[in-house]
């Protein structure tokens, strides 16, 4: 009887994700001789691969996400010329639905204070220079002071991501080509000035609370099951047009450990993002800097949640939220109010949203 050879899963260069799975599969197939190439050996090999991946801690459904083709995502459900995406949910009835949640009139601020000491990712900066003037010569001795700010007003602090911010290849939301809408002075379509004021039902999904921790572990991927269990625990269901806010606890590091804050973070993964998109929210926000888990479990994929929500589905992102007070008071449902700055052609905006209950 022919000896069955073991398939080795020990590969010094192996790491999590699709690349590792492919290497294991190739190695397995190489060990199947012509006499053994039938359905049963392939089934055994497949089971061996799955068991090996699980044993090594590699997710079988690793996030090997690839963007859909243009004709699968465009035109937008809001129309081929649409520039507002999920902001189209903003209607009088949306505002009225939100105001019905206000019982005490308490206002909870959801934005961090902007200062030169805030966490900054990549090449972003926030430099403030005080501009002092002398007293003028009028009899009332009026003086004047101002500030000069050198910064990216769209991508610092608590920030709102608009549609030009991310692309799939050379196209943004609704398949507008970057080369055709980008100008020296901003984007001629999809600019943040098109969004307008957003007043809607806000829902805090407290995943850190669900897990019984102050801060979720670094690089923890929030799953669909996490979101569903947290909502059940809070006795809430999502509705179209909601502002969905996810509490990870990562915001506790803001201004205290900026290096750790900006290095990685817990957040939603691909499956959770696709599930949220099906709930048809107005926006998805979190108390971390990219909303999604970083680094991505698949090292070959870069920030796919941004593409899934912004580019494919036309759903806005809200980053670097201050959620500790909201979570501590267990305010899970509230009126959400936010207005992006009216900056023509910008891809995002620094914002100061509030929750009112």
Describe the predicted segments one by one.
Residues 8, 25, 32-33, 60-357:
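Active-/binding-site microenvironments in catalytic and ligand-binding cores
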């Amino acid at each position: 009887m022919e000896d069955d050879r073991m398939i080795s899963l020990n590969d010094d260069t192996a790491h999590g994700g699709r690349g590792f799975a492919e290497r294991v599969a190739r190695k397995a197939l190489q060990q199947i001789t012509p006499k053994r190439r039938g359905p049963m050996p392939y089934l055994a090999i497949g089971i061996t691969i799955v068991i090996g991946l699980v044993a090594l801690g590699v997710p079988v459904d690793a996030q090997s996400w690839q963007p859909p083709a243009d004709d699968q995502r465009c035109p937008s459900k809001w129309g081929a010329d649409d520039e507002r995406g999920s902001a189209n949910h903003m209607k009088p009835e949306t505002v009225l639905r939100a105001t019905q949640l206000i019982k005490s009139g308490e206002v909870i601020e959801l934005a961090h204070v902007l200062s030169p000491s805030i966490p900054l990712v990549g090449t972003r900066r926030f430099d403030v220079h005080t501009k002092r003037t002398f007293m003028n010569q009028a009899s009332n001795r009026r003086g004047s002071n101002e500030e000069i700010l050198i910064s990216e007003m769209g991508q610092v602090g608590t920030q709102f991501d608009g549609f030009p911010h991310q692309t799939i290849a050379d196209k943004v939301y609704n398949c507008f080509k970057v080369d055709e809408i980008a100008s020296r002075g901003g984007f001629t379509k999809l600019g943040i000035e098109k969004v307008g004021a957003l007043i809607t039902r806000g829902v805090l999904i407290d995943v850190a609370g669900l897990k019984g921790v102050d801060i979720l572990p670094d690089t923890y991927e929030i799953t669909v099951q996490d979101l569903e269990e947290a909502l059940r625990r809070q006795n809430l269901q999502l509705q179209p047009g909601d502002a969905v806010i996810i509490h990870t606890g990562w915001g506790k590091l803001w201004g205290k450990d900026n290096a750790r804050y900006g290095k990685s973070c817990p957040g939603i993964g691909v499956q959770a993002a696709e599930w949220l998109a099906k709930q048809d929210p107005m926006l998805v926000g979190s108390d971390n800097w990219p909303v999604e888990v970083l680094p991505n479990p698949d090292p070959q994929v870069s920030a796919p949640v941004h593409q899934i929500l912004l580019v494919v589905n036309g759903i806005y992102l809200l980053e670097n939220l201050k959620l500790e007070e909201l979570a501590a008071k267990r305010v899970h449902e509230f009126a959400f109010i936010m207005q992006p700055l009216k900056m023509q052609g910008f891809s995002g905006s620094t914002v100061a949203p509030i929750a009112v209950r």
